[in-house]
Amino acid sequence: MAERSFTEEVKKLRLGEGEVFRGEGILAVTKALLESGVAYVAGYQGAPISHLMDVLADAQDILTEHGIHFENSASEATAAATLAASVNYPLRGAATFKSTVGTNVASDALANLASGGVTGGALIIVGEDYGEGSSIMQERGHAFAMKSQIWLLDPRPNLPSIVAAVKAGFELSEASHTPVMLQLRIRACHVHGQFTASANRRSPFTLREAMNQPRRDTSRIVLPPMSFAHEKEKVQQRWPAAVKFISGRGLNEFFAENEDDVGLIVQGGNYNTLLRVLERLGVADVFGRSRMPLYVMKDRKSVV
C-alpha cells in the first residue's frame, strides 16, 4: 500500500527540455531516471526512500509510455537481483531500497552483481537511514560498497546535484562495467528545490528486444574459475576505468580552492551541514560562499 499519493505531482515528470522543475527530491530522482533512458526499475518500501516507490506507482502511465518496466519487489534481495538484466544486455536499470536494513537483505545479490560486472548501467538508489531522524541501528551503506567494490555517489543535497548524480551514475556504471550505488540521506530525499529539466528518453534497447534476442556469456557467471578472473578484472580494468571517468568528468568538486592553503575534505551529503557550521564560525556566508577551500567528494570509490 502506498504511504502517500503523488497523483498530482507526477504530472511534473512530463516537463520537457528547458522547463523548470520544482518539487521534492524523490520526485526529482524519478525525473532523472526518465531523462536517463532507464529500461526498468525495481524496489522495496523502506524509509527514507519509500516515497520513491509511491511516485513510481503513481507514474505508471508515464512509465508505460516510455517502455519502462516497474516492479514492486517482494524484498530488497529480489530488487537487487533484478539488476541482473543489465549484466548481458545494454539496459539501464535501477533498484531502490533503504540502507542498511535493505542492503543487508540484498548483500548476496549485490556481491554477485559486482563480481560479474554489468554491460548496461546499473544504479542502486539507497535511502541512507542514518543520523538525525533515523529509525534503525547506526550503520551505513558505505561498508557494502567497500566490500563489493561498488562505486558510491553521495551528491550534495540539492536538486541539480542529485539529478546530475543519477545521470552520472549510469554513465559511470557503463564506463567501468560496475554497478553504482547512489546514496540519498534522509534530508536529501525530502529536500525541495528546482532544476532545469531535460527531455525524457526511451531506452534505445528494450526489454522486449532482450527477450527476443537472448544472450549468454558464461564468463559473467560467478563460479570458479571465472570468479577469480573477476577479481583481476576489478583491479586491472574496472577500477582504472572508473578513476578515468571520475577525473575526466570532475565529479568531485572544489570550492574556494584559492582562498587559503588549508582546507576541508567533506562528503557530498554533509556539504550543507558543513556550510552552516562555517557560517556560524564566520568563515562562510548564508549564501554558501566559503572563505575556506572545500573539496567535496561526491564520488567515493572503494579501496581494495
Tell me the role of every PLM-derived stretch:
Residues 2-26, 156-304:
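Flexible, low-complexity linker and terminal segments
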Residues 25-27, 31-32, 49, 79-82, ...:
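Structured alpha-helical segments in the cores of large, soluble enzyme domains
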Residues 40-42, 94, 261-266:
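Short hydrophobic beta-strand segments
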Residues 45, 97, 296-298:
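Residue-level recognition of beta-strand->loop/alpha-helix junctions
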Residues 47-174, 185:
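Thiamine diphosphate
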